[in-house]
Amino acid sequence: MTQPTARSIPLQVVSGDTAAPAPLQTGVKQIGGDKIHRSPVQFVDAPVLRKPSWIRVRIPSGNAVQNLKAKLRENRLVTVCEEASCPNIHECFSHGTATFMILGEVCTRRCSFCDVAHGRPKPPDANEPASLAITVADMGLKYVVVTSVDRDDLRDGGAQHFVDCISAIRTSSPNTRIEILTPDFRGKGRMDRALDILALSPPDVFNHNIETVPDLYPNVRPGADYQWSLTLLQRFKAQHPSIATKSGIMLGLGETMEQVQATLRDLRAHDVDMITIGQYLQPTPHHHPVMRYWTPEEYKALEEYGNALGFSHVASGPMVRSSYHADRQAAGAGVAA
């Protein structure tokens, strides 16, 4: 059996700098240390764990990656693949697939695991839905994933912009299946407004990531709430029983097997159909450190556990990400044609 790679020292969390940070400027990105410096928690320097043999990324040759990047820039589009430093970017781009990130590239949250920039976002780009639809049609995509930064500055959390993008894609590419990976729409009345708006043009798959176990939320997802995310998933499913719901969990942040299993049970109890489970990789030294590399055998055990709970599809493996091979995941759950 593969031996786990883990820290021999406990994670130490220190409170953020008490000095008031400089005011945010609209559209200016706070990344890496600048972003985490504004977070409620920061992390004491610790030795970096050596990546085990099963954490490897193939970088394919050819011009496909650069060609796709050029097309995205031409249409002023952003992918979460680039902004979040996804390890699978070269594989996905080389196959002509991408997860589009709408509503800008500046997030109002400061999650300690995420490499997307923090700051004060610009207003939504009214031309973005049309540009996205053109790109999807040009690429001939049969399955597309659309996600966004958190937009706590918007009354609907960006739900109307999601609907505008869905409608535009369906107009130009009626046979394309659409998965949306949404923020939590947290805030007074925001979830209600968002769900009412999404009902106007719902996706083929509704995805919202739970990310981690509840005990780790204060350090991993400051500004988010575990039960709120579960409720969002359940309420969408209640409104749209025939639409698949999906969520994702990262491993390696300090959780235990028992905690992960409990989270899987919570997701099923809240009517989530599909689940992705993958290894967290630290994007910069300023972010939450990797506490442990889970083994392939453990991912297999979680896949079997999830199947036993009744998920329609479980994708569990070190390099699995929420939208990695999303078309295959959906096909396995009976969504994509």
Swiss-Prot record:
Ranges in coiled-coil conformation: none
Keyword entries, A-Z: 4Fe-4S, Cytoplasm, Iron, Iron-sulfur, Metal-binding, S-adenosyl-L-methionine, Transferase
CC cofactor: [4Fe-4S] cluster
Cited SUPFAM superfamilies: Radical SAM enzymes
Pathway, per record: Protein modification; protein lipoylation via endogenous pathway; protein N(6)-(lipoyl)lysine from octanoyl-[acyl-carrier-protein]: step 2/2
EC number(s) recorded for this UniProt protein: 2.8.1.8
Keyword Disulfide bond in record: no
Cofactor mode of binding and number, as noted: Binds 2 [4Fe-4S] clusters per subunit. One cluster is coordinated with 3 cysteines and an exchangeable S-adenosyl-L-methionine.
Domain of life: Bacteria
Any one Gene Ontology molecular-function term assigned to this protein's record: 4 iron, 4 sulfur cluster binding
Localization terms from the record: Cytoplasm
Family recorded in the similarity comment: Belongs to the radical SAM superfamily. Lipoyl synthase family.
Protein name as annotated: Lipoyl synthase
Species, as recorded: Xanthomonas oryzae pv. oryzae (strain KACC10331 / KXO85)
Highest classification ranks of the organism: Bacteria, Pseudomonadati, Pseudomonadota, Gammaproteobacteria, Lysobacterales
